[in-house]
Amino acid sequence: MSNTGLPKPWIVKISRSRNRPYFFNTETHESLWEPPAATDMAALKKFIANELQESVTPTEASNSPKIRASHLLVKHRESRRPSSWKEEHITRSKEEARKLAEHYEQLLKSGSVSMHDLAMKESDCSSARRGGELGEFGRDEMQKPFEDAAFALKPGEISGVVETSSGFHIIQRHA
């Protein structure tokens, strides 16, 4: 481990859009908002406090309340990026995607499947590998319709279908 407390090959970078640290694997190019497993948290906190304090400047977004949420995304051919880890070229229509998202919403709200399990299998977002977990975020960090829906939920609640330029989402707020 380096003085960052991160296991090799992880490093700390600063997100220009969110003005906060994130964790980057130099071998796999994976990025995480939360520290990877086997991180020495005390060393990481010390590193961030001592080395990165000047790099991260407070912004209105970083001082706003934060929430944690998971989601499941159903993309369609008109989505902002009509591809996913499951399909290189998504061909379903917008209406087909909406109906599929509504079906997933019913499954989640009936309790027959968890967000984690359904997102891992069905979500078109790269967060699927984490069960749809998005980590912590504040205002002005997500697309407005998504953010408004997520912040309106109480912890544990599941949203209806939310449309953004990415596709159709079902969101579950955790905290």
Swiss-Prot record:
InterPro entries with a match to the protein in the record: PPIase_dom_sf, PPIase_Pin1, PPIase_PpiC, WW_dom, WW_dom_sf
Enzyme nomenclature, EC number: 5.2.1.8
Keyword line: Cell cycle, Cell division, Isomerase, Mitosis, Nucleus, Rotamase
Segments forming domain PpiC: 64-175
One GO location term (cellular component): cytosol
Source superkingdom: Eukaryota
Any coiled-coil regions, as ranges: none
Function, as annotated: Has a role in the G1/S stage transition of mitosis where it is involved in the dephosphorylation of cdc25 and wee1.
Protein name in the entry: Peptidyl-prolyl cis-trans isomerase pin1
Gene name, Swiss-Prot/TrEMBL: pin1
